[in-house]
A protein has these predicted regions:
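Interfacial segments at transmembrane-helix termini and the short loops linking adjacent helices
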Residues: 38, 107-123, 315-345
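Membrane-interface junctions at transmembrane-helix termini in multi-pass inner-membrane proteins
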Residues: 8, 130-152, 341-369
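Signature of the first transmembrane helix
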Residues: 5-64, 101, 162, 223-250, ...
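Membrane-water interface segments that mark the loop-to-transmembrane alpha-helix transition
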Residues: 5, 9-25, 47, 56-105, ...
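Helix-loop junctions and terminal segments of transmembrane helices
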Residues: 58-75, 143, 258, 262-287, ...
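Hydrophobic alpha-helical transmembrane segments
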Residues: 118-125, 151-202
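Transmembrane helix-bundle signature of multi-pass secondary active exporters and lipid flippases
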Residues: 48-56, 228, 232, 236, ...
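Interhelical loop/hinge segments that connect adjacent transmembrane helices in multipass membrane
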Residues: 1-3, 7, 148, 152, ...
Length: 369
């Protein structure tokens, strides 16, 4: 009974945490829908998705393998391993952030974006590194089952972002580089304290050979997870670039507006994922296979039930949303909402099986998902 209460408490903290983050993304999206042109909103979603890819790559490269391995280690050894992996993660983040910023800057020049290519590239590069650093802190805290600490850190991130956005609105328009610089500052402020703790926890007597050994251990598990994550990202986000290239960013804005209304489904799925990985890892480590099966089945049924209930409620308030929020420029997007709902129903079941494979350490099969 006590174990169930603890898991329920962590679940609520995780849901609140994801609600904060997704709510922030929702506010940004709604503000762009309401006050910006379709072209601006469409381009923003493409660039933000590219930033998301780098975070996913780092999580699959280090975070997923770290979660799997940590469940099998004693507490003291786990803490040292997580701290050493933090430095590996920071180096990998920099190696991804720098070329990502260069690519964005070059594309901004070639495609004649109405912003400075240098400023846009710098803002994007700094955002990628800062976002990745905070995501690692979240992973490390979840490994230690500190869901409340994660929620507090993300609360700081949300508050700093909102305060900065309010300041920008007071002085004038917000451009894309301003948004990424603001998110960089918010990520740094939120994760600075725990990042400092991780840095000090490694000590000064760690040899390079130890880091190389850790890299080899992580890579032995994560190399297939990286491929699987890239395939998963393409499945979730390739429409941004194909639809933008074929139908234009105006049509892309309609697609994203419909998807934005289903954000609560994403919130629940992400909250479950962050909690399920360490919980399932513990079940596997203790050979509680029957309990694991029940957990997977009940999780799938619960999330699919939520999907149906939310979709029904959404269509009840849909006329009001169109009239008072989206306006005439978006028109009727109900068919797009239904198509997205079908996609999320299938993706929910796929996500459960993906996390199960990751937790087992069976990363190669992820490639075929």
């Amino acid at each position: 009974m006590a174990e169930k209460k603890v898991f329920l408490f962590r679940s609520m903290a995780s849901v609140i945490d994801q609600a904060l983050l997704s709510g922030l993304n929702l506010l940004i999206g709604l503000a762009l829908i309401r006050y910006a042109s379709k072209e601006t909103y469409g381009l923003y979603t493409q660039l933000f998705a590219a930033g998301l890819l780098t975070t996913i790559l780092l999580d699959s490269l280090i975070g997923s393998a770290l979660t799997t391995l940590s469940a099998r280690l004693p507490a003291d050894e786990r803490g040292r391993f997580v701290a050493r992996a933090a430095k590996i993660h920071w180096v990998a983040s920099a190696l991804l952030a720098i070329p990502a910023g260069l690519v964005v800057g070059v594309l901004a020049k070639l495609l004649d974006f109405p912003v400075s290519p240098v400023v846009l590239g710098l803002s994007f590069s700094s955002f990628v590194f800062a976002q990745a650093s905070r995501e690692y802190c979240r992973t490390a805290l979840f490994i230690e089952s500190q869901a409340v600490a994660v929620a507090k850190m993300d609360m700081v991130f949300v508050l700093v972002t909102i305060a900065g956005a309010a300041a920008f609105f007071m002085v004038g328009d917000i451009g894309t580089p301003h948004i990424f610089f603001l998110l960089t500052i918010a990520n740094v402020v939120a994760s600075a304290a725990f990042s400092s703790t991780l840095w000090r926890s490694t000590g000064r007597d760690i040899k390079w050979g130890q880091y190389l050994a850790d890299v080899n251990v992580l890579w032995s598990l994560s190399r297939w997870a990286v491929i699987g994550s890239v395939v998963g990202w393409l499945g979730n986000n390739s429409y941004l670039y194909f639809s933008g290239a074929i139908a234009g960013v105006v049509a892309l804005a309609d697609l994203n507006a419909a998807r934005l209304l289903l954000m609560p489904i994403v919130i629940v799925g992400m909250a479950w994922t962050t909690l399920a990985r360490p919980a399932m890892g513990e079940m596997i480590a203790n050979s509680k296979i029957h309990k694991l099966r029940q957990f997977v089945l009940k999780s799938t049924l619960a999330m699919e039930s939520f999907n149906l209930i939310y979709l029904g409620g959404l269509f009840v308030v849909y006329p009001w949303l169109i009239a008072h929020l989206f306006g005439e420029k978006y028109g009727d997007i109900s068919n797009l909402i239904l198509l997205w709902a079908c996609y999320f129903a299938v993706n929910t079941a796929r996500n459960v099986s993906t996390i199960l494979l990751i937790t087992y350490g069976i990363f190669r099969e992820l490639f075929w998902q």
